[in-house]
Amino acid sequence: MRIQVKIIGPLMYAAGFSDKEVEVPPGTTVEGLVLSIGVPADRPRIVTRNGAAAAPGESLAEGDKVAVSPIYSGG
């Protein structure tokens, strides 16, 4: 299945891209996608799927739009 992935901030250096369509097998979860594109497992992040917060175990569907962003702090 094809998933559109947008990486925000310094995580794009780990993934090697900032915006790209990726091919994943059916049944891939949010966490499986994030790890497969090279984002380190120990890196805090926020993931959205089609504009809403996504749980790590949530299954993806053809055409989903996923955004991965580091967690920012400060003011």
Roles of regions detected by a PLM:
Residues 1-74:
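Ubiquitin-like/PB1-type beta-grasp interaction modules and other compact soluble beta-rich domains
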